[in-house]
């Protein structure tokens, strides 16, 4: 997975574990990823709409964000 320009910034901590991330590409926030009910939920904006997707694996959500925000 080509995530060279991707940077994660934790912004939410639950029980000393980071459960919320802002996702940046080239210094611009492009998405968020949060853990809810044992699943990771990713959200990006596409024009005026918000696209959301979820998976049990963090890497799958990050990969989807990477593909959709190129």
Regions found by a protein language model. Name each.
Residues 1-26, 52, 56:
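Negatively charged, low-complexity tracts enriched in Asp/Glu with abundant Ser/Thr
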Residues 7, 18, 42-45, 66:
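Residues marking helix boundaries in flexible regions
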Residues 9-11, 37, 41, 62:
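Alpha-helical context
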Residues 21, 25, 34, 48, ...:
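Generic cytosolic/nucleocytoplasmic N-terminal low-complexity/intrinsically disordered segments
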Residues 32-49:
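Short aromatic-glycine-(Arg/Gly/Cys) micro-motifs in beta-strand/loop hairpins
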Residues 44-46, 54-70:
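A short, charged, amphipathic alpha-helix used as a generic interaction element across diverse proteins
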């Amino acid at each position: 997975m080509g995530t060279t320009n991707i940077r994660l910034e934790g912004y939410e901590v639950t029980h000393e574990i980071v459960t919320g991330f802002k996702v940046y590409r080239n210094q611009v926030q492009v998405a968020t990823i949060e853990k809810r009910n044992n699943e990771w939920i990713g959200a990006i904006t596409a024009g005026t709409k918000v696209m959301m997707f979820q998976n049990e694996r963090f890497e799958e959500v990050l990969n989807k964000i990477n593909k959709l925000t190129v």
